Amino acid sequence: MPVLLEAKNISKSYLVNSGLFGGSSVSVLHDVSLQLQAGEILAIVGESGSGKSTLARQLVMLEQPDSGEITLGGKSFQSIPDIHRQVRMIFQNPAASLDPRKRVYQLLEEPLINLTKLPGSKRAELIYHTLDQVGLNRGQVSRYPHMFSGGQRQRIAIARAMILSPKVIVSDEAVSALDVSVQAQILNLVMCLRDEIGMSWLFITHDISVVNVIADRVLVLYAGRVMESGSVTDVFENPAHPYTQRLLQSVPGSGGSDSAVAVEEIVPAVAQMMEQAGCAYRHRCLLADQHCAESEPPMISIAGRSVACFKEQVF
């Protein structure tokens, strides 16, 4: 499949402790590269603080990266005038991302008014068609967001993102706050939309079980750096990077000794690790040696599988 969305060497830092005499910056993303193919669901995994949401904001142009380039269909984002129409985002909390003062019809009509020149009749037709696609009742368009369940609000958020027929939807922890049964419904909806209309998804999550269900490929992010990427089958059945192995051990029922809580404790000082030389994971890696402390491992790619680790021999 052709590459649709590509990020090359994206880096992002933020100013902290600013004051009268200046401040210091903390690197949150460091040379992150990824490719999203047409009609694909690519998952980005990593625990809190790994840079997942920051990466999402760069990919939808909510923020500008410090360096690197993002392209859509081979064209730089900067040269695409309607980029916000072609790449849309779904946020984690629909209650916060949906204006509580607006009815469903207004929420769905707003992007059509702002980003298209469609007349009112065509906007209405598209709104009702999109409601049908996400499984919402047309008779509910006059309701406000607070009148819906969490799963229904997330369907509204999905409808709002897809109503412009974007090429890519970036989903940032969009199902993490939902209970298991509602989560399954939303995941099924995402897969159906991909299969029926060929929409590409970049699915950001910390939940490995979700990735197993929904994704074609997975990219593992740690301390703002890519540790490993490849097909879900390859990466999860034969993890090459020690951090990926640790993540998989944390999944309940995996047989690993770690707990899900332990994974959240892997990065006690992410900011400091990002600023130091060498492998970002070396402080927690049982295989780390002096080479890992002095040099950052390059990303090695073979047949669509990539890993950044000096200790990995064959994958």
Give the label of every model feature segment:
Residues N17, S231-F315:
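Charged, flexible cofactor/metal-binding loops and thiol motifs
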Residues M1-E237, V307, Q313-F315:
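ABC transporter nucleotide-binding domains
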